[in-house]
């Protein structure tokens, strides 16, 4: 195929590669990755589908926070137990549980 010209598309491809190599459980559960009108990354999980809002900057750092959050809830809940996870704020997860 042709070479992706958009910086954000290239950034998305690099991010997906890094997730595949370093956070495989998340990679296996990604249904889609998109950018909203504010150029914020959004990941939708296969399960349920949970929406994860990552924002525009420090995406990998936010994914590391998400991975720690996932480890914390392991055995009690899964990421898919939440309707959405908002990672736009540094070092915190804003979570809305499914009803």
Q: What do the predicted segments below correspond to?
A:
Residues 1-99:
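Charged, solvent-exposed interaction patches on well-folded alpha/beta domains
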């Amino acid at each position: 195929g042709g070479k992706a010209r958009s910086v954000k598309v290239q950034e998305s491809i690099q991010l997906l590669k890094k997730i595949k190599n370093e956070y495989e459980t998340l990679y296996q559960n990604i249904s889609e990755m998109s950018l909203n009108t504010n150029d914020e990354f959004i990941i939708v999980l296969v399960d349920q589908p949970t929406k994860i809002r990552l924002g525009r900057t420090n995406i990998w750092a936010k994914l590391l926070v998400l991975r720690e959050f996932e480890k914390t809830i392991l055995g009690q809940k899964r990421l898919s137990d939440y309707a959405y996870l908002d990672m736009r704020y540094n070092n915190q997860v804003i979570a809305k549980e499914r009803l």
